[in-house]
Structures are given as structure tokens and as C-alpha cells.
């Protein structure tokens, strides 16, 4: 039985379905759109429709199911491939054979879409709710054939026929998640508009009017994709009043959302996560990341440790990251998983990673672009000494320390620039990165002039050894230099970003002139990287690079023991000291170096300790580093920071073992590894290393760093809209144009290396050591009562620093400037003057001159976080409104940027622009429903959660994550978003959105409580004068007054 209607909705032109049937009564009927006759047909049941449909002539079978959004429905996808489109495998999958036809290309993309659907289903329903989906539960139909223009067209419907969702909003959200995870080139093939509130969806056996392409089952297709072979017509219908499993309501229910929360794996974490796949990658290859899941494609059958059987179909392997733990999952068993290990920053990550290196489950060698040069441009060998260098315009030499790089360089100079050579009077410039290294080189090349031993013009000297900061003493001439030597070339590039240049612009200009124009360039470095390759290609690209690489593993007899446990490391150190061993201790932490010195002195007062850091006097560094054989021969324990690097080498076999302590808060991995080689010979060849590093999320590709850098400057040229703090480009200033200078490109390369170290410090450190041929092990040992003592000494050292600064002389601006200049010039400064200078800087920062300060004041207000929050509050409180404050800050930073781009570009790149960080922080705050940083408003749980869902589900937080170096949150989970927002507010202002008894309001963090907002300047403590919203009784001032007074009245 059926009824026909001209229209679906009520109107004045005729009878409509809606005139007779309510939405409630339509639940029990089957509504079909008859495209051929332009009618809507309402059947009492599906069986009535099938019976009637079978009797219709073929050309009139143009039927579409009318799916009402409020009804439960199957998840469905409409896939269309445009006519005459070329589906190149280069855009599909690197593992697909190049010689395939168009059918194969379409099928590759279709298979990719099915995989992504399964991945999203797994993350959304399988993990939280233990609901499975296999390929056998996916129905695939097609309507391949000629369209109206007689052109071949591919069209497919994918239906998850055993499951249904509550309504079209759930289906729409699931489809959006699938689209988010598809590659950009695949996205256009999937129709995103198939989940409307009223949706027409073609019925099996039907075709579109005027087209002969019939929607049908395809057994061959099902066999290819291993999908369902069902031919039951009702399984293809979308509206599902009964026969399916109804999935939980995920996307339209805030409370449900939290239960399935997960963090997205960042690019900086992916490398570490993939290491855990280890031998599993023999049968799988990496496919992509989806939220907190790493997905793999099967390449061959494999045994599953979870299911305890072989799998030969499906992409069953999944790695899930929860917190910092990495778990292995199988699609066929959602109840069980295997713990693979922990990401860096956790206690056992170092040990887990070393174990994988020991079992050769990880490839430790990081290939560089030089290795990809064609064979005629490479000389690669494995010998215990260096071969003769090639006479080529651009020569790059890589080899480990003590294999004879400098010996061969001397031979090269003698052969081509010696007394009997035609080039003996040609100009040679030997550039180094440290003054002490320059002196070391001169001792081996006595016929070169050392820049620091002569005054005035250096151009008159044919052969000069010069440090990068003094390059301004050279000038460009009509004739280029004949030979430019860059020893430790990676460190030279680093030095241009050190901020230590007094005359940066002329020094960098002469460096680039020599690099671009020199007849011959030789670059040498044991830690050669892609930065050198990219710089040479960019600025010497007119001549080919020749790569000379001796792969000899000189460190193959060295043994490295790694741990993340300071306690284990300290206990081993104490044991060796008790056995009277002589020990070397390099560390990239000044505090750790001071702590170790004090700790050892208390335990072993009879031992002589050599200690070198940035705090060592200039006289001590110069005299000792020029004669390390004597001075280091006097000590039992040698402790040093990165102030000692290349150029300082102790050759005697005096020390027994090296203990290194490194973290990712200081210099990069390459510098840390270089520090290990200052004592060349250890009796035991034993290195015991403690590595610590929190997880960071810095951009680490040139493209991302450049995008982030230019974006911060772009915002300075935009007009701020006071409504919802949005941006438009200013008509007056327009969009900025950036001139990408040589320094800009070098700076990007240097940032990339620094960010890689900050993000992957531990893995890169261990990899670089293992790549030298050294053996790596896990450091173990007995536990002793050392950590408490160690921590106690650390607190004593810090407290003494606070006392020394608080009690230091109060100096004026003139004396502070003199001390600053002496430090910059390397002139020795008295220790008491250093403390006085620190005190001056602290008082100057808070404009607190004339006030007496205590050690407690120094402890609280000299911290990085308190200073950062104070600066943020001052900047956002300058105007009468947040909008006005932002505009003032934007104008100030825009003026500086324009000046810097005209006068000193390096200042612009090294300047920390803060306007964008304020824009993001305030934007997050306003999206939550607060007007500004002092808004006393209180939101209910329901209000805030609704805001978090409405405002952030569609908002891309990538730029905010980049700005604050935070992990991007899962946008479907309000609590995760709130946690992310609080991190941003805490970093910028010392604030958080606090929850108490079902309500949310703005509250100070611990650091923020030290710097209250006030209407007028007060004499109690450093504070921020603010003209923003009125400060009420519930605001922060009242709650913070007490601890401030306690701080300042302490004696």
C-alpha cells in the first residue's frame, strides 16, 4: 500500500506528505522520492516498497530513500570520482606499484578511505566502548558506468550496515572526523553533505534519471576489499528502526565526550612512538596518525601477540598513546593490549630506548643530504686514518675525532699552498667559532697569523685564523679569497645565533661574501648535518659539493651506560669516588655543576676539584685552557659546563671514567656530545650518562618554523576587531612583505636543530652516541641514601644565592652598566659585584628601587615564571580596556619590527614578540565567556562546558599550540580543552579558570598571586596598576595581599 504526494513539506501549491503525516507517524512508514515521476511515495512498510519496485520498468527505477535526521540511521559515505581525472599513485601510496591502470588507482584511494573510516570508528567506539567493526561489517555498492555525456564515472556507497547512530548530527560529526583524517588530495572525493536533516539516498537497483549507472552489489568489489558479501536489499537502507546495534551518542552529548577523551600525537612525538614498533615493522609500514593512535598498513602475514595467532588480512596493528605510555592494540581484540614503553620525560624511557638500541630494534643512524649526492661527488670509505683531500671548489669532510682530519688538512695546505706551489701567495682565511679553538689551530698551523695577536687591518695578512665575532676586521675586496676553511662548521653557524656579536652585521656580511665568492671552500665537522648542506646549496649552488666521509668507528671500544635516574647515577658516582677513581663530569646545567661540586666537596674534602663554567673568571679560563695538560693534571675530579667545547683537549691518560649529566633545557645534543670529547683518553673507556628531558612541542620543520615566525609578524600589520578579537588587514600598513636574507635562511636552519634537540633530546643523544660505534648499556646499581642529601645541598646553594643577592650592595645605573660592559668584553668581575648586578636587575625589572628586599623576595620574584606573568599583566593592563591594551602593544612591536627590518634584521629574528601570545590568550578567555583577565563573572558548569563545545570543536588550535609550545588538545573533549586553556593563561598571566562546587571563575596561580592587579600604586609589593574592570571583593587582590605582606616583612 502506498500514497503519492507532490511535495514533502507543506506549501500553497498542493498536497504534501507533511499535511497528512507527522514526524512521529512517519517513523513507521517508508518514504521514497520518485525522481522519474517527480513524486514522493509513502509505503506502509519496506516490504510493500520492494514488492512494488520489482514491478516497475527499468527506465523508471529512479528511487531514493528519504532519510529523516531525527531517526536512527546507518553511517554512510558517498564517494564520487570526477570524470577524466588522473589518479596518480604519487598522490596515493608510495608502496603502490607505478604501473597500474585507472581502476587500480581508484581502488587504492577507496581502500584508503575504508581504512580511515575503520580507524575513526576504532578510536571513537572500539576503545571507549568495546564495539568492534570489521571489513565484513562494511557494505560496498557501486554505480560505475557512463554518465549523460557518455564518459566513464566511478561512484560508490560505503555503508556500515550492522551499526547505527542516534540521528543525523551524530552521523555528520562522524563523517567530519573521517574527513579530517583523510589526505588533502582524497578529501574532495567524499561528499560531506549526505547527513542533512532530510536526506535523499539512492536505493539499490536504482539509477539517476537520464543515466544508466545502476547502484548495485558487486561481488568482485567485495572480494577485492574483503567487505560484506551480503545481497540483502534491506541492509543497504539507511533508516534503521530495528535490525542494528545503536552506537553511543558521542558528539551531541558533552558528558559522553569526556569519557572518550584523548590527546593528539604531535609530530615531535611521532618519531619516538614509531621506535616502539620495532620488529613489528617487518610486516607493517606506517600509515598515518589519528588522534592518539598510530596506524599501520599490513605488508605481509604476521603473528599477533595479543590474539596469539597469525593475521594475514586487515591492518590490525595499532599503537595507542595514553599519557606517556605506548600500548600495542589489535583490531580483533579490543579488551587486551600490550604495554610497549614510555615516551621521553618519563622515568623509564631512557632505559626502554637503550634496550631497543641494544637489541638493534632501532636504526640509530640519521642519514643526511650529503649521503644522497651522486657517486661522482662522494668519497666514502672506512679506514683508521684519513685519505688525501680532493682539490674541488666545495669540499665537505666528515669523520670522527682523532682520525686525522687536521693532519690531512696540513698536507692539503702544503701540497697546494706550500713554498713550491703556484698558489703559495694566495689568500687563506681559517674561520673558527671560539677564541681558544683559534689558538689551538695556530699551534698546529704556525705559518698562519692569529687575529688576536695583531691589531688593525687584517687584509694585509695572507693567512689568517679568525674567530667569527671578529670577522668585521676583514673587508671584501675585488678579488675573492682563494681558500676558506670552516673547521667545526656546524658550531660556526651556531655562533652566528649566539647573541655575542658586538658587530654582527659587518661580521656576517664578510662571512657570506667569503662563502659565496671563495675559489675553494673546505668544511670539516664530525657532526655534519643538513644545515651545512642547505646553506652550501643555497649560497654556493653554482659549483657542485664534494662529500669526503670516513666512516671509521673510532669509538667502537667505548662503553656508554645510560639512565634517567639521578639516584642510580649518583650512586655509581659515589661508588667510583670511594674507589679513588679520577672522574670527569661534564654537564649542560650550571646549577647541576655547582651542586655536584658542593656535594663532592662535602663527601670527599681531600679531593681536588677543577671547576669551569660561565662564572669562571676570564683570566682563569684563558690561562687554564691554554695549558690543560698542567692544570687538569692537578685535579682528581674535573667538572665543566658548555664553556668548554671544541679546541680544548686533554690528551693524557689520567682520568678513569666520565659521568655526564644532561637535559634538554640548555644547549643542543650536538654540543653535549662534543663536551664528552674534551678528555680524549679514559682509562676504562667508560661513560656513565644521566639524561633528563621533558616533552616539548616546538615546530621542527623549516616550513613550520617559517610559518610560525612570519605569522607573529603578520599579526602586527592587522587591525584588531573589538568584537570577538578577530583580525583584518589594516588599509594603512597593508600586508607585510618579507625579504628573506642569507641570515634569515641560516637562522631557520639553526632553529630547526635547536627545536629537534628540545623535542627529541634523549633519543637524538643516544642515537648519536650509538652511531659512533660505541656500545650502549643500561646503567644499574645499588641504592644508597644520596638523593635526600643531594636535594638538601641544592636547597642550601639556592638559599645562599638568595641571601647573597638580597644583602649585596645597592648600585646605581652607571655601575650596573659598567659591570654589564665588563662581562660582555670578557673582563673579570668580582663576585660581590656580580651579586650587586643581579640585585640591580631584579629591582629594575619590577621598578622597585629604594625598597629593601629579603632572601624570600629574591626567591619568589626572581623566578622565570613570576617575571613572565608580571610582564604579561603589565602589557595587558596598559589601557582602559583589553582592546586598548592590545592595540598599544601591537603598535609598539610594529614600530620595533619596522625599525629592525630597516636597520638590523638579526635583532628582529631574535626579538621575542609577545602581541600574538596575548591575542591568543585573550581570545581563549573570551571564548570561554569571560571579558578580560579581571572579570569577576562566575559561570556554571553547564555554561562553560557548552561554551567549550560550541566555540572550540570547529576552531583550529594549531597556531595557539605553536605559540605556547604546548601539545594540541583533543577538541571533542571539553575538559582537555580547559586544561589546555589554563596552561596558556598560566604561562601568560598567572591565571586559571578555577572549578569550585560546580562553578568556574578566574583565579590566580601560585606565581600569579605574587603580582596583584591594583588601581593605584602601592608600597607593599611589586604590583600591576590596572584600569580594567572594577576590582570586586571576590577578585584576586584580597586573597593575595596576605602572602605578599608576609614576604616583605620577613627578616
From Swiss-Prot:
<keyword id="KW-0235">DNA replication</keyword>
<dbReference type="InterPro" id="IPR027417">
    <property type="entry name" value="P-loop_NTPase"/>
</dbReference>
<dbReference type="Pfam" id="PF03121">
    <property type="entry name" value="Herpes_UL52"/>
</dbReference>
<dbReference type="GO" id="GO:0003688">
    <property type="term" value="F:DNA replication origin binding"/>
</dbReference>
<dbReference type="InterPro" id="IPR003450">
    <property type="entry name" value="Replication_origin-bd"/>
</dbReference>
<protein>
    <recommendedName>
        <fullName>Putative helicase/primase complex protein</fullName>
    </recommendedName>
</protein>
<dbReference type="GO" id="GO:0006260">
    <property type="term" value="P:DNA replication"/>
</dbReference>
<dbReference type="Pfam" id="PF02399">
    <property type="entry name" value="Herpes_ori_bp"/>
</dbReference>
<comment type="similarity">
    <text>Belongs to the asfivirus F1055L family.</text>
</comment>
<keyword id="KW-0244">Early protein</keyword>
<comment type="function">
    <text>May be involved in DNA replication.</text>
</comment>
<dbReference type="GO" id="GO:0005524">
    <property type="term" value="F:ATP binding"/>
</dbReference>
Amino acid at each position: 500500500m502506498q500514497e503519492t504526494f507532490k511535495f514533502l513539506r507543506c506549501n500553497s501549491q498542493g498536497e504534501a506528505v507533511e499535511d497528512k503525516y507527522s514526524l512521529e507517524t512517519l517513523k513507521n512508514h517508508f518514504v521514497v522520492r520518485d525522481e522519474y515521476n517527480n513524486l514522493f511515495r509513502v509505503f506502509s512498510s519496506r516490504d510493500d516498497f520492494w514488492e512494488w519496485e520489482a514491478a516497475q520498468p527499468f527506465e523508471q527505477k529512479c528511487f531514493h530513500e528519504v532519510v529523516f535526521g531525527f531517526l536512527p540511521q546507518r553511517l554512510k559515505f558517498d564517494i564520487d570520482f570526477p570524470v577524466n581525472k588522473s589518479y596518480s599513485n604519487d598522490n596515493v601510496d608510495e608502496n603502490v606499484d607505478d604501473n597500474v591502470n585507472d581502476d587500480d588507482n581508484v581502488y587504492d584511494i577507496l581502500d584508503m578511505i575504508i581504512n580511515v573510516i575503520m580507524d575513526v570508528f576504532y578510536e571513537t567506539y572500539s576503545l571507549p566502548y568495546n564495539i568492534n567493526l570489521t571489513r565484513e561489517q562494511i557494505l560496498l555498492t557501486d554505480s560505475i558506468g557512463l554518465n549523460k555525456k557518455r564518459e566513464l564515472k566511478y561512484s560508490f556507497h560505503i555503508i556500515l550496515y550492522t551499526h547505527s547512530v542516534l540521528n543525523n548530527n551524530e552521523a555528520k560529526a562522524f563523517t567530519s572526523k573521517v574527513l579530517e583524517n583523510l589526505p588533502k588530495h582524497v578529501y574532495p572525493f567524499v561528499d560531506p553533505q549526505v547527513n542533512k536533516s532530510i536526506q535523499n539516498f539512492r536505493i539499490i537497483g536504482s539509477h539517476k534519471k537520464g543515466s544508466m549507472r545502476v547502484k548495485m552489489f558487486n561481488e568482485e568489489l567485495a572480494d577485492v576489499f574483503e567487505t560484506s558479501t551480503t545481497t540483502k536489499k534491506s541492509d543497504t537502507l539507511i533508516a534503521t528502526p530495528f535490525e542494528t546495534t545503536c552506537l553511543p551518542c558521542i558528539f551531541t552529548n558533552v558528558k559522553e565526550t569526556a569519557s572518550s577523551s584523548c590527546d593528539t600525537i604531535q609530530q615531535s612525538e611521532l618519531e619516538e612512538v614509531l621506535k616502539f614498533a620495532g620488529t613489528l615493522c617487518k610486516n607493517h609500514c606506517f600509515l598515518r596518525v589519528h588522534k592518539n593512535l598510530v596506524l599501520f598498513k599490513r605488508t605481509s602475514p604476521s603473528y599477533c601477540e595479543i590474539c596469539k595467532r597469525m593475521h594475514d588480512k586487515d591492518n590490525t596493528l595499532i599503537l595507542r598513546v595514553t599519557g606517556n605510555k605506548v600500548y600495542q592494540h589489535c583490531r580483533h581484540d579490543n579488551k587486551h593490549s600490550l604495554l610497549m614503553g614510555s615516551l621521553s620525560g618519563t622515568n623509564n624511557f631512557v632505559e626502554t630506548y637503550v634496550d631497543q638500541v641494544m637489541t638493534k630494534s632501532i636504526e640509530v643512524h640519521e642519514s643526511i643530504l650529503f649521503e644522497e649526492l651522486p657517486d661522482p661527488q662522494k668519497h666514502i670509505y672506512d679506514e683508521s686514518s684519513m685519505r688525501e683531500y680532493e682539490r674541488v671548489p666545495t669540499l665537505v669532510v666528515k669523520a670522527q675525532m682523532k682520525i686525522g682530519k687536521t693532519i690531512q688538512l696540513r698536507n692539503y695546505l702544503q701540497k697546494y699552498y706550500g713554498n713550491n706551489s703556484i698558489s703559495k701567495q694566495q689568500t687563506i682565511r681559517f674561520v673558527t667559532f671560539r677564541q681558544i679553538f683559534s689558538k689551538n689551530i695556530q699551534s698546529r698551523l704556525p705559518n698562519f697569523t692569529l687575529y688576536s695577536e695583531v691589531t688593525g687591518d687584517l687584509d694585509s695578512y695572507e693567512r689568517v685564523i679568525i674567530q667569527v665575532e671578529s670577522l668585521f676586521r676583514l673587508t671584501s675586496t675585488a678579488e675573492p679569497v682563494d681558500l676558506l676553511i670552516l673547521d667545526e662548521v656546524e658550531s660556526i653557524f651556531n655562533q652566528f645565533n649566539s647573541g655575542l656579536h658586538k658587530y654582527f652585521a659587518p661580521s656576517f656580511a664578510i662571512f657570506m661574501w667569503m662563502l659565496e665568492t671563495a675559489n675553494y671552500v673546505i668544511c670539516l665537522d664530525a657532526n655534519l648535518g643538513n644545515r651545512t648542506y642547505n646553506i652550501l646549496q643555497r649560497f654556493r649552488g653554482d659549483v657542485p659539493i664534494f662529500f669526503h666521509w670516513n666512516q671509521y668507528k673510532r669509538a667502537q671500544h667505548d662503553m656508554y651506560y645510560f639512565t634517567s635516574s639521578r639516584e642510580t647515577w649518583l650512586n655509581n658516582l659515589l661508588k667510583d669516588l670511594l674507589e679513588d677513581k679520577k672522574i670527569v663530569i661534564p654537564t649542560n646545567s650550571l646549577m647541576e655543576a655547582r651542586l655536584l661540586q658542593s656535594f663532592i666537596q662535602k663527601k670527599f674534602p681531600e679531593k681536588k676539584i677543577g671547576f669551569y663554567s660561565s662564572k669562571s673568571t676570564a683570566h682563569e679560563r684563558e690561562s687554564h685552557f691554554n695549558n690543560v695538560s698542567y692544570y687538569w693534571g692537578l685535579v682528581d675530579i674535573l667538572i665543566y659546563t658548555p664553556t668548554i667545547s671544541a679546541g680544548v683537549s686533554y690528551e693524557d691518560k689520567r682520568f678513569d671514567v666520565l659521568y655526564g649529566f644532561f637535559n634538554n633545557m640548555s644547549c643542543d645534543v650536538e654540543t653535549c656530545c662534543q663536551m664528552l670529547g674534551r678528555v680524549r683518553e679514559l682509562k676504562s673507556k667508560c661513560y656513565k650518562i644521566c639524561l633528563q628531558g621533558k616533552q616539548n612541542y616546538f615546530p621542527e620543520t623549516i616550513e613550520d618554523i617559517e610559518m610560525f615566525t612570519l605569522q607573529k609578524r603578520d599579526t602586527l600589520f592587522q587591525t584588531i576587531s573589538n568584537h570577538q578579537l578577530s583580525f583584518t588587514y589594516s588599509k594603512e600598513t597593508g600586508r607585510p612583505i618579507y625579504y628573506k636574507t642569507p641570515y634569515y635562511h641560516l637562522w631557520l636552519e639553526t632553529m630547526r636543530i635547536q627545536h629537534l634537540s628540545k623535542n627529541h633530546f634523549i633519543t637524538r643523544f643516544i642515537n648519536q652516541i650509538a652511531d659512533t660505534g660505541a656500545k650502549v648499556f643500561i646503567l644499574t646499581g645499588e641504592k644508597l641514601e644520596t638523593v635526600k642529601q643531594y636535594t638538601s645541598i641544592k636547597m642550601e646553594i639556592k638559599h645562599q644565592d638568595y641571601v647573597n643577592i638580597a644583602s649585596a650592595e645597592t648600585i646605581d645605573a652607571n655601575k650596573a652598566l659598567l659591570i654589564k660592559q665588563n662581562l660582555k668584553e670578557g673582563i673579570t668581575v668580582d663576585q660581590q659585584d656580580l651579586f650587586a648586578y643581579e640585585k640591580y636587575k631584579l629591582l629594575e625589572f619590577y621598578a622597585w628601587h629604594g625598597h629593601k628586599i629579603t632572601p624570600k623576595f629574591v626567591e619568589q620574584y626572581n623566578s622565570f615564571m613570576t617575571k613572565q606573568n608580571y610582564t604579561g599583566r603589565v602589557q595587558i593592563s596598559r589601557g582602559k580596556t583589553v582592546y586598548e591594551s592590545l592595540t598599544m602593544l601591537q603598535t609598539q612591536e610594529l614600530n620595533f619590527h619596522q625599525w629592525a627590518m630597516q636597520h638590523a634584521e638579526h635583532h628582529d629574528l631574535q626579538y621575542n614578540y609577545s602581541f600574538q601570545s596575548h591575542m591568543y590568550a585573550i581570545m581563549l578567555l573570551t571564548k570561554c565567556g569571560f571579558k578580560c583577565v579581571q572579570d569577576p563573572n562566575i559561570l556554571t558548569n553547564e555554561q562553560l562546558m557548552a561554551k567549550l563545545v560550541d566555540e572550540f570543536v570547529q576552531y583550529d588550535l594549531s597556531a595557539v599550540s605553536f605559540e605556547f609550545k604546548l601539545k594540541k588538545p583533543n577538541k571533542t573533549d571539553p575538559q582537555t580543552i580547559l586544561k589546555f586553556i589554563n596552561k596558556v593563561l598560566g604561562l601568560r598571566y598567572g591565571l586559571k579558570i578555577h572549578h569550585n562546587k560546580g562553578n568556574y571563575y578566574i583565579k590566580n596561580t601560585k606565581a600569579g598571586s605574587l603580582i596583584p592587579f591594583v588601581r593605584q600604586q602601592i608600597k607593599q609589593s611589586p604590583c600591576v596598576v590596572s584600569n580594567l574592570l572594577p576590582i570586586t571583593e571576590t577578585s584576586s587582590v584580597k586573597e593575595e595581599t596576605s602572602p605578599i605582606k608576609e614576604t616583605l616583612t620577613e627578616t
